[in-house]
Amino acid sequence: MKLYSLSVLYKGDPKAVLLKAAYDVSSFSFFQRSSVQEFMTFTSQLIVERSGKGSRASVKEQEYLCHVYVRSDSLAGVVIADSEYPSRVAFTLLEKVLDEFSKQVDRIDWPVGSPATIQYTGLDDHLSKYQNPREADPMSKVQAELDETKIILHNTMESLLERGEKLDDLVSKSEVLGTQSKAFYKTARKQNSCCAIM
């Protein structure tokens, strides 16, 4: 999972104005970096120009995803990432950056601003922090921990069962479980199996 670009733009009529941008092109060869950066700027402007105000979208181009968020006040943000990067985290980042940007930069500067004139320094920090979505986004971190717990629990149950043994057989042979508990287990098992897609 990788973030390549984080941009803040103003959706003018008809052109989008780049206000500030941060790039991570370290994964590209030295001779490609400036061209890749220019292409990302061009793509970001084009996507904002073609998106409506108050909209969010994800545009796929080969193995890259461009996430765009254009607010109703014409302030827009674009994240360019690989296709594995979670879109929910990308939109969380865009919302956070645009809120922060709108508080630090006067609205009258948006239509006439440029990367040289806009005084906002948060993009590089956000780009590096959000490279690992699990660390940057609490929900992703919790989801990853839940997935790991599921794997551990699944492996633990399998390791408790001996070769060829099934949990169903153990439940039916059990002397500790009462008939009501066995009936509950069988009912739960049937309900879970009827809903499985085969």
From Swiss-Prot:
**Gene Ontology cellular-component annotations:** apical dendrite; basal dendrite; cytoplasmic vesicle membrane; cytosol; endoplasmic reticulum; endosome; Golgi membrane; mitochondrion
Q: Where is the v-SNARE coiled-coil homology domain?
A: 138-198
- Residues modified as Phosphoserine: 159
Biological process according to GO: endoplasmic reticulum to Golgi vesicle-mediated transport; protein transport; retrograde transport, endosome to Golgi; vesicle docking involved in exocytosis; vesicle targeting
- Lipid sites, type S-farnesyl cysteine: 195
The protein's location, in the record's own words, is:
Cytoplasm, Cytosol; Cytoplasmic vesicle membrane; Golgi apparatus membrane
Q: Which Gene3D superfamilies match?
A: 1.20.5.110, Longin domain
Which residues are assigned to the propeptide feature? Answer: 196-198
What's one GO MF term for it?
Answer: SNAP receptor activity
Keywords attached to this Swiss-Prot or TrEMBL record, sorted alphabetically, are:
Coiled coil, Cytoplasm, Cytoplasmic vesicle, ER-Golgi transport, Golgi apparatus, Lipoprotein, Membrane, Methylation, Palmitate, Phosphoprotein, Prenylation, Protein transport, Transferase, Transport
| Residues with Cysteine methyl ester modification | 195
| Maturation and modification | Palmitoylated; catalyzes its own palmitoylation. Palmitoylation is required for Golgi targeting.
Q: Locate the Longin domain: which residues?
A: 8-131
EC annotation? 2.3.1.-
Lipid-linked residues (S-palmitoyl cysteine): 194
Query: Main location per UniProt?
Result: cytoplasm
- Tell me the membrane topology, using the record's own terms: Lipid-anchor
Task: Relate the protein's function as given in its record.
Answer: Vesicular soluble NSF attachment protein receptor (v-SNARE) mediating vesicle docking and fusion to a specific acceptor cellular compartment. Functions in endoplasmic reticulum to Golgi transport; as part of a SNARE complex composed of GOSR1, GOSR2 and STX5. Functions in early/recycling endosome to TGN transport; as part of a SNARE complex composed of BET1L, GOSR1 and STX5. Has a S-palmitoyl transferase activity.
Q: What is known of its domains?
A: The longin domain regulates palmitoylation and membrane targeting.
Assembly mode: Identified in 2 different SNARE complexes; the first one composed of GOSR1, GOSR2 and STX5 and the second one composed of BET1L, GOSR1 and STX5.
- Output the PANTHER family linked to this UniProt entry: SYNAPTOBREVIN HOMOLOG YKT6
User: What is this protein's record name?
Assistant: Synaptobrevin homolog YKT6
Its source organism is Mus musculus
Gene name tied to this protein: Ykt6
